[in-house]
């Protein structure tokens, strides 16, 4: 890449199947300079969360969901991170799991908001993925920091489960924090399909939609290169250049 350009790399769930594929993802990121990393949930995680939601969100087994997320991610974490970094990841993961396990009171207070609850609970797949990638990159001595898209200000309209990105507002909210992070030598690791509505409630862009940053790149609003990395075996780049 030319000087001053930033590469955006989006890793899909098929790249995040097990410890081996995850290690290859880390190697790819480690070999880049001036990049933003956008993560999906680990393979099968979102589908499993949806299966837990079933037909009745109000009766979801929150402890069972928490146990699944803990087991799925700790199996991988234990193979790639160690010592104090692993301990910090475990603590941060526990805080997310506590939020899930205590969500029953909110379900009881707002029984009719099925899509709202579904979006909130589904978002943890990507949030934990970002947390684990960030921890693993730090284990390798890299200055990585995790960002949740709804905290950055990825604004959506429409439904909770298939929101539409508000392009202008979102681009204004997120450009400076992310660009400044890269200029300061940081690797921002960001969720891909999570946003928030004008009330600050968690929304999703939909499983078949484009992730939020690609909407911005499509509009040629930022000077970046976008690489979507799909293949589990070869990790072939499929670039779309956005001048």
Language-model regions: role of each:
Residues 1-243:
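Nucleotide/pyrophosphate-binding catalytic subdomain
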